[in-house]
Amino acid sequence: MAAKTKTLELEDNVFLLLEGNLKRIFATPIGYTTFREFQNVVFNCANGQQEIANFFFEMLINGKLTQELAPQQKQAAHSLIAEFMMPIRVAKDIHERGEFINFITSDMLTQQERCIFLNRLARVDGQEFLLMTDVQNTCHLIRHLLARLLEAQKNPVGEKNLQEIQEEITSLKNHFDELTKALQ
């Protein structure tokens, strides 16, 4: 971490201004535009000064004070970090990856001589979906997604991404081997 340098000169009311605007933003549910609203507030409170904007971003996203502050302002900064760092990080995740799957859970039911899976998918943005499958549909879905991974392997970026999850791919292979043995 870079050493803290001179004391950053900020207007006395800037932390109150930040706090009020952040409370307004987070008084409503977090959505795709929330992080952009946060960025606008930071730029407005920084009065167009990039150094101050960067300080606020580092402070509110990562919880770090990269420059010295006057004692009262330092206390106000820590208060803002404690109250708003986590909601800002969630807003950033939703802005960047809101439609990605965050969590999957499944329940299995037996119905008329068929296994039915109730698959619940939750996205990063909090939306949840129910996907009902049976054994045949589940196999079809796996085959489709596996074909997509094979397609990704033909792309340099996709190949790099697959290398990063090599252990998970090996785990999938082991599960397929276990299932194949059980069916023999």
Curated annotation (Swiss-Prot):
Domain of life: Bacteria
InterPro entries: CT_584-like
Transmembrane segments: none
Pfam families: CT_584-like (PF17435)
Family the UniProt entry places it in: Belongs to the chlamydial CPn_0803/CT_584/TC_0873 family.
Protein name, per record: Protein CPn_0803/CP_1068/CPj0803/CpB0832
